């Protein structure tokens, strides 16, 4: 940033001379005085002609003309550009003498030009002398001010010149230090020389940022960014011994081979030489990381540091040493993509105002990103982790974790706008519990080789878990899905979806459950479980289906419990095979129910082991239906029939008018609550309304329990009547 050459003093004076006359005349105190003086002189000359007594005679006309000419000449002479623009002492004396002589002549001759009988001649002469003296005083003051202005201008010019020379010298010296520091940083022999170069460069960045002589802050940043780029480039540069990180991190060489004595000594000596060089380079690079890290932290938590305005590019780096960037604050984009971390990587409690790129990286040890805030996009896709902690983080735009591999991962308690975890592999446990997804959540096509926990999460828009494999069980208990949720085509060892709320559609079709599956106590708008296989027990007990429920074309190899549930719309069970015990007791089917052929299934259901249970003799629970127009046709060639009495399963009844009206009102209120939830999505009020829905569903469950419980007194009366 070199300074431009300034015009010298002579050029400046030459350029300004043509303006000085105007500047001189524009000074109101001087030009005004001259004009007033000339006006007074004009009045004095004209007064004798204008007076009533007509005091002037023809003999004095020449004298008056003389005095008038003298006054005009004096005025012109005082305003002569040569005199006005002159800085020399003789012209000031000329102005003073001209004024004095002119005033004296007027004081002497003007009274003569007036009749001798005129009174006040002495006063007139006295006034002229006073006016002349005042004019001389004004000229003196003007000259003094002019000299002061000239001196001040010269001093300012000198100061500016000295300041510019000093700044030019300082910046030149900085660039010399920068060049030398770069040479030191490239020294291959001594780590101490490289370390000196690091600290010099760090100090130069601080100096540029603190240089207030550079008015624009962005210009200071530009100078500092050049140095930051060099420091980042050094971190990115390859180091030959990095590939021996594991061996050189040990205190001594470990080898099972037996060598001859001299060979063993050579190997040991070479090991300690390499270890010393390795550790020296680690120290140099750690010093760079530490100096950057210290300046990325503000005085308070989550506040910017002195270097937070820079961009950092560590892409493609191999960190063969621990990396600590905790509590860092980045205002600009930061790039760590395609990097390899051989030691621990700690990025927790950091704030990223710009985009954060970590994709395509490999973490050989732990990676900690917990408690961080990403105000723009964050890309962690295609990475490999041993263990990774992203818990308690906030992603205000998009977050991409797709195609990654984790030994174990913790994403619990985080908040996402739009999140993509698709196509990832979790080799041990994965925890996503207690998280909030404000926009779409894409977790399809993932593989969970260990346990997975999604418990208590909220999905404010769509959530897609389709085509995933859970080899050791997964927990989705107590979650809320405010738009459609897709779990279709997945494979589960065991799965727990109990106590969840699905505001729109829930698709579990075409899935396989190798062991148990628990959907108990959930609330669905509409639900599709068709074409699924349950190799172990499955529990749908105590659920509420506000829309259609489709269980058609499924296979149940173990027990299937549908008891204690409420179906507001149609329920489809056709084309399914039930190989174990099936329980529908204590349920309410408000609309039609289909076990035979229908639009969803071309075949009827088949109960191969025993007939389904619609009446629980032990707990005295029956099933209530809202319509006679149901289809209980099942395949009796391969299984058991449904026992019927008057087109109704044995010991079951129709809803009475009072029960129907109650349910109609309940369903109407639940619909209103659902609409409120959709309207308040994303607000604090939303959680309260969700809790209201849970409480309302609890009341419905309690009412259903009472309504489906058969009172023993009534049974006894019926037996006596029969």
Language-model regions, residue ranges each:
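Short hydrophobic membrane-inserting helices
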Residues: 1-139
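Membrane-proximal alpha-helical anchors
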Residues: 75-77, 84, 114-207
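N-terminal leader/targeting and pre-domain segments
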Residues: 164-167, 175-195, 199-202, 206-243, ...
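Short amphipathic alpha-helical segments, especially helix-boundary/capping motifs
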Residues: 158, 263-266
């Amino acid at each position: 940033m070199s300074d431009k050459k300034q015009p010298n003093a002579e050029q400046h004076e030459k350029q300004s001379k043509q303006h000085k006359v105007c500047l001189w005349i524009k000074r109101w105190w001087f030009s005004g005085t001259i004009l007033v003086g000339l006006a007074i002189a004009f009045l004095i000359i004209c007064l004798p002609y204008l007076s009533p007594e007509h005091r002037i005679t023809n003999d004095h006309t020449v004298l008056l003309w003389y005095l008038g000419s003298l006054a005009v000449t004096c005025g012109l002479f005082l305003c002569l550009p040569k005199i006005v623009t002159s800085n020399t002492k003789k012209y000031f004396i000329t102005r003073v003498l001209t004024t004095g002589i002119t005033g004296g002549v007027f004081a002497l001759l003007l009274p003569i030009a007036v009749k001798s009988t005129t009174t006040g001649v002495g006063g007139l002469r006295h006034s002229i002398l006073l006016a002349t003296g005042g004019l001389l005083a004004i000229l003196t003051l003007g000259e003094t001010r002019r000299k002061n202005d000239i001196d001040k201008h010269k001093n300012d010019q000198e100061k500016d010149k000295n300041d510019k020379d000093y700044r030019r010298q300082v910046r030149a010296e900085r660039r010399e230090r920068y060049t030398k520091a770069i040479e030191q940083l490239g020294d291959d022999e001594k780590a101490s020389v490289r370390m000196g170069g690091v600290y010099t460069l760090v100090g130069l960045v601080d100096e540029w940022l603190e240089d207030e002589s550079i008015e624009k802050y962005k210009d200071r940043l530009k100078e500092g960014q050049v140095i930051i780029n060099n420091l980042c480039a050094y971190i990115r540069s390859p180091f030959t011994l990095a590939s021996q990180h594991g061996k050189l991190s040990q205190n001594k060489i470990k080898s099972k081979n037996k060598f001859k004595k001299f060979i063993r000594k050579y190997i040991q000596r070479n090991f300690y030489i390499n270890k010393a060089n390795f550790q020296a380079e680690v120290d140099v690079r750690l010093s760079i990381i530490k100096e950057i890290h210290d300046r990325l932290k503000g005085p308070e938590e989550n506040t910017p540091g002195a270097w937070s305005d820079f961009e950092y590019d560590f892409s493609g780096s191999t960190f063969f040493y621990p990396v600590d960037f905790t509590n860092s604050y980045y205002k600009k984009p930061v790039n760590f993509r395609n990097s390899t971390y051989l030691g621990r990587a700690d990025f927790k409690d950091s704030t990223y105002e710009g985009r954060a790129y970590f994709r395509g990286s490999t973490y050989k040890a732990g990676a900690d990103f917990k408690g961080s805030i990403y105000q723009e996009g964050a890309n962690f896709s295609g990475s490999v982790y041993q263990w990774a902690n992203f818990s308690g983080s906030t992603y205000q735009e998009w977050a991409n974790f797709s195609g990654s591999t984790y030994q174990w991962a913790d994403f619990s308690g985080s908040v996402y706008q739009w999140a993509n975890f698709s196509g990832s592999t979790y080799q041990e446990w994965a925890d996503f519990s207690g998280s909030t997804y404000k926009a779409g959540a894409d977790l399809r096509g993932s593989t969970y080789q260990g346990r997975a926990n999604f418990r208590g999460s909220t999905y404010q828009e769509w959530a897609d878990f389709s085509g995933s494999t859970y080899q050791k069980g997964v927990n989705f208990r107590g979650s809320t899905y405010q738009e459609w949720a897709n779990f279709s085509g997945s494979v589960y060892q065991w799965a727990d979806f109990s106590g969840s709320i699905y505001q729109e559609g829930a698709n579990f079709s075409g899935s396989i459950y190798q062991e148990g599956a628990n959907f108990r106590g959930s609330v669905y708008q509409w639900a599709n479980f068709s074409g699924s296989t349950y190799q172990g027990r499955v529990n749908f007990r105590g659920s509420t289906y506000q829309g259609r429920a489709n269980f058609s074309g499924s296979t149940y190899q173990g027990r299937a419990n549908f008891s204690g549930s409420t179906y507001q719309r149609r329920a489809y069970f056709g084309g399914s095979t039930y190989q174990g015990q099936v329980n529908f007791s204590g349920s309410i089917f408000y609309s039609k129910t289909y076990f035979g052929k229908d639009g969803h299934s071309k075949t009827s259901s088949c109960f191969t082991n025993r007939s389904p249970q619609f009446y629980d003799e032990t707990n005295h629970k029956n099933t209530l239906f809202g319509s006679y127009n149901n289809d209980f046709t099942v395949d009796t060639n391969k299984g058991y029939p449904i026992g019927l009495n008057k087109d109704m399963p044995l010991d079951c009844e129709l809803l009475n008018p009072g029960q129907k009206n109650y349910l109609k009102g309940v369903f109407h209120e639940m619909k209103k609550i659902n609409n409120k939830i959709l309207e308040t999505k994303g607000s604090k009020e939303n959680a309260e309304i969700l809790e209201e829905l849970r409480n309302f569903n609890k009341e419905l469950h309690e009412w259903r329990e009472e309504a489906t419980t058969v009172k023993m007194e009534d049974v006894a009366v019926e037996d006596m009547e029969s």
